[in-house]
């Protein structure tokens, strides 16, 4: 079993290319859960994210959910989340219609955007000795609300700077004679994803801490299940009492689904109150 776990972890890390991550973040969430019956439960929570090397808050979210435990090993869930996301400033090269001839850069200012998200889950848990294997399949729909930002266009590259006497605009170590600013409309759009997650946790005898690891990947349902994002999480849950739970984890995300583009290492801190 230990050899299998080690091999699984190595494969997951290799596939994620963690060395390519270019950001560090701090994620936090607070949640409450109420058991209505032995089978039904409701929950609510808020989450905050600070990224861009902890320089910017990039997410404020709030959600509610409903859970149904069909058997000891099978459960279902549904939820809604409102997201207020911050999109960092982005610089992209611009090309002519042939797709090859470089003409300059487009720089989009940072902006906030609202999203509405609905999710439906099917989860399974199978105990194997002191280990528990978990599987979750989630359909996730996200609606992006239309908004506006400002775009700056740099055009007409200067190839002979020494002999140039006009205005100079510099970006990405290249020089241009023209700079224009315009409103950039970010239209409303919808995204559909299938988010699959596999996990393993270990029950340490006479210990309040339960270590776990999960591997999750997101497939775009609108583009032939294209793999857009992978996420690896390694952490532990502390069962303080029957009602209070504390969670601490390291998260690595690679790629972008309907969240912001992010190749990011993050420290995740969570607290849940169950009653």
Model-derived regions, located:
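Outer-membrane beta-barrel translocator domains and adjoining extracellular loop/strand segments
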Residues: 23, 55-60, 88-95, 146-153, ...
């Amino acid at each position: 079993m230990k050899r299998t776990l080690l091999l699984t972890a190595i494969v997951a890390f290799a596939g994620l290319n963690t060395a390519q991550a270019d950001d560090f973040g701090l994620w936090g969430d607070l949640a409450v859960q109420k058991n209505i019956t032995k089978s039904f439960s409701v929950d609510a929570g808020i989450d905050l994210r600070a990224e861009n090397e902890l320089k910017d808050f990039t997410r404020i979210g709030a959600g509610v959910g409903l859970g149904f435990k069909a058997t000891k090993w099978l459960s279902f869930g549904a939820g809604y989340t409102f997201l207020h996301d911050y999109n960092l400033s982005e610089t992209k090269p611009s090309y002519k219609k042939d797709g090859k001839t470089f003409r300059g850069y487009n720089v989009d200012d940072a902006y906030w955007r609202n999203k509405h998200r609905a999710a439906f889950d099917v989860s399974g848990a199978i105990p194997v000795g002191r280990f528990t294997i978990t599987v979750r399949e989630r359909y996730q729909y996200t609606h992006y609300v239309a908004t506006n930002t400002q775009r700056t266009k740099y055009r007409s590259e200067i190839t002979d700077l020494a002999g140039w006497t006009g205005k100079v605009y510099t970006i990405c170590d290249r020089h241009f004679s023209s700079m224009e600013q315009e409103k950039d409309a970010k239209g409303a759009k919808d995204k559909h994803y299938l988010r699959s997650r596999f996990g393993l946790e270990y029950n340490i005898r006479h210990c309040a801490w339960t270590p776990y690891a999960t591997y999750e990947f997101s497939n775009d349902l609108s583009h032939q299940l294209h793999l857009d994002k992978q996420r690896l999480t390694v952490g532990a849950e502390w069962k303080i009492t029957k009602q209070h739970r504390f969670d601490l984890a390291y998260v690595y995300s690679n790629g972008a689904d309907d969240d912001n583009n992010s190749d990011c290492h993050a420290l995740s801190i969570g607290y849940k109150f169950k009653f």
